[in-house]
Amino acid sequence: DEIDVQRIAVIKPTAFGDVVQSLPVLGALAERFPAARVSWVISETLSELVSDHPGLDEWIVYSRRGGWRSWGRLLATLRNRRFDLVFDLQGLLRTGVMTRATAAPVRIGLETAREGAGLACHGLLEDSGRQVPAHRRYWRVAEFLGVGHLEPQAGLEIPGSERAWADVMVRQLGGRVVAMHPGARWETKRWPIEHFATVGAHAIREHGASLVLVGSPDERIATARLKELILRHVTEGRVENLAGGTGLKKLAAILSAADAVVTNDSGPMHLAAAVGTPVIGVFTCTTARRSGP
């Protein structure tokens, strides 16, 4: 209340699922500071998650590929924006440097900050440690701003063209459509592919479902193997392998159009929850209480 907040930065460049879970912060900022200009520092690969968001005025791309010159340009951009309020929701060394570079009069982080990132902040939000579920941790921003009574909404924008594509895909497949994502960033988070195949075959055989397999380009080999295993179990069934063939907007569209999603603890799990599709999440080394949508 003691400063005139006109420019706000959210620094959360990486971690697919966590970016999705932190999107409701934008609605809180819009409620508390309706006239402020809001920017988000985001990695190239995840920029689609925030592009065209109604609560965002600008996304600033963070790229690891550009070397020191790119890094210097990013820090200069952050400094020149003259932000009044900054939230570091990543809490790593690199985001601590970004946060400090803004020279904003108010810089706030989370108790999960490590690698010295907390030193760049004027304060860390209480009850935002690792013992708190991730989605609750990010919503502490809203509570700090006095608007925690709001219903958290991701506010993801799915273009009409992507929705139309997904609708056509679902109609062509026919019946109930179940999306499956067998991948995850950590190997220890990945449920055995054979188990996914058993579930997929059961959905086809017992419920007449069609399957859509999703994932990144790196996961296409795994989804191809999954399709092969499923079709060993059932003589008939529609299984479409879309892994590596969709951007994040199309992924959101197909997950939104599906009747259900079966997935490991991963970014697509949180994206499916954000667009309102029922999710069956498989947690191996993590827990639903801390990491669930």
PLM features: residue spans?
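Catalytic machinery of carbohydrate-active enzymes
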Residues: D1-P293
